[in-house]
């Protein structure tokens, strides 16, 4: 695999990128520059994890609702730079949540028009069932930050939904307000997928629990139902299943936070969403 810094140098050289600026995150090196006349972003992931195959996932959507991919390999992707790159979260945080939800639904709709993958290619990606193993890991860990009864409820619901899925496809897997950016030429587009195989109802879970820094904005039954009506109207999905996925994924998201080393209590945004959904689950 090599050191991340060396891999950055290799990708810059092999993909012909003239670097203009660079930033580092906990997980990645992100370089802004040009390839010929095209403004590009080069993202190099530090080590294998959720985003290791983000280039392959994005490329599979063929630019339908996503940033276009020019090159990719494991742990690195070269894609078009979105300008100005305003995150969808900015609309929601300005009090335009209904508009932001409609945009999120539109992006999901465009992504669902991507070419179908063969069964062999689908098997190459993690499935919703694979991600659900987090429930058992948590129950076996001895951690008690999340109530065991809540984890067990989430686990039962999650795997019931997995067992009854229809029309599974490649999904973004983390389609929330910070992973949808505005481009003046192409509109709102998704970036930074994790890639998971599941039904379309699975895709809205991340959007229900964001923008995560303002849980009071989304963690209420009224807001959840309002957002669900928008998704149902635009995507023709099954609202009861989408709501159930939203609950189960919220619990799983809190589990992932624990696994990532974060303290989790009742104020955790994902748990607050789970609490808001539970009374309206059918």
Please provide the spans of the model-predicted regions.
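An alpha-helical support segment within catalytic cores of ATP-dependent transferases
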Residues: 3-9, 113-173, 183, 233
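A conserved alpha-helical element in kinase catalytic cores
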Residues: 5, 38-78, 86-111, 220
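Active-site acidic catalytic loop and adjacent metal/ATP-binding pocket
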Residues: 24, 29-34, 69, 155-202
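Short Gly/Ser/Thr- and Asp/Glu-enriched loop/turn motifs at secondary-structure junctions
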Residues: 25-26, 72-74, 247
């Amino acid at each position: 695999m090599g050191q991340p810094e060396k891999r950055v140098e290799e990708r810059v050289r092999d993909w012909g990128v003239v670097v203009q600026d660079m930033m580092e995150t906990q997980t990645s090196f992100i370089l802004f520059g040009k390839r010929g006349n095209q403004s590009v972003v080069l993202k190099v992931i530090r080590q294998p994890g959720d985003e290791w195959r983000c280039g392959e996932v994005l490329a599979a959507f063929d630019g339908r609702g996503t940033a276009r991919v020019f090159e990719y390999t494991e742990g690195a992707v070269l894609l078009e730079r979105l300008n100005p790159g305003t995150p969808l979260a900015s609309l929601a945080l300005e009090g335009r949540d209904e508009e932001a939800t409609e945009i999120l639904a539109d992006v999901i709709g465009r992504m669902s028009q991507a070419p179908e993958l063969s069964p062999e290619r689908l098997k190459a990606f993690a499935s919703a069932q694979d991600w659900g193993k987090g429930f058992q890991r948590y129950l076996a860990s001895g951690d008690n930050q999340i109530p065991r009864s809540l984890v067990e409820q989430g686990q039962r619901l999650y795997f019931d939904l997995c067992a009854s899925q229809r029309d599974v496809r490649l999904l973004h897997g983390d389609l929330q307000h910070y992973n949808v950016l505005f481009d003046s030429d192409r509109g709102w587009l998704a970036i930074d997928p994790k890639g998971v195989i599941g039904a379309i109802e699975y895709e809205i879970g991340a959007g229900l629990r964001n923008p995560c820094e303002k849980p009071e904005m989304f963690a209420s039954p009224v807001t959840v139902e309002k957002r669900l009506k928008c998704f149902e109207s635009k995507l023709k999905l099954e609202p009861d299943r989408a709501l159930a996925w939203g609950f189960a994924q919220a619990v799983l998201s809190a589990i992932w936070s624990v696994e990532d080393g974060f303290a989790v209590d009742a104020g955790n945004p994902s748990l607050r969403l789970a609490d808001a959904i539970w009374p309206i689950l059918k």
